[in-house]
Regions:
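Long, low-complexity, charged/polar intrinsically disordered regions in eukaryotic proteins
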Residues: 1-29
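Positively charged, polyanion-binding regions of nucleic-acid-associated proteins
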Residues: 23-42, 66, 70-76
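Alpha-helix C-capping/helix-to-loop hinge sites
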Residues: 37, 55-59, 77
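Short acidic, hydrophobic short linear motifs in intrinsically disordered regions
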Residues: 42-54, 58
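Alpha-helix N-cap and coil->helix boundary residues
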Residues: 43-47, 62, 66, 84
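Short, positively charged loop/turn segments that connect secondary-structure elements
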Residues: 53-69
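Short, cationic-aromatic polyanion-contact patches
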Residues: 85-94
Length: 94
């Protein structure tokens, strides 16, 4: 009997022409780590990715790819705000 495929989540980013389909468990793990990492205030992407990697040291996949993909979805959902020049991320409402 074939192994069932893991659940997928469609993610979108502002100005993306197509959605990306990612493993739901990975999305939830990365999204949770992003939200926990942004609790301290606005940070650059490199620092955000490093914090996520520290929170998920055994993550199976590219932490930086999943971080940018998930942070853009959280931005569309209104949970995260991306500031321009220099680009910084922070929680919505801060």
């Amino acid at each position: 009997m074939p192994t069932p495929r893991p659940a997928r989540t469609l993610v979108r980013g502002k100005q993306w022409t197509a959605r990306k389909s990612v493993d739901t468990a990975k999305f939830e793990a990365i999204a949770g780590a992003i939200l926990a990492s942004l609790d301290a205030g606005p940070i650059a992407f490199g620092e955000l990715s490093a914090r996520v990697e520290r929170l998920l040291p055994r993550f199976d996949g590219s932490v930086s790819w999943y971080t940018i993909t998930c942070v853009r979805e959280l931005e569309v959902r209104g949970q995260v705000v991306r500031q321009e020049k220099p680009v910084r991320y922070h929680l919505s409402g801060r």
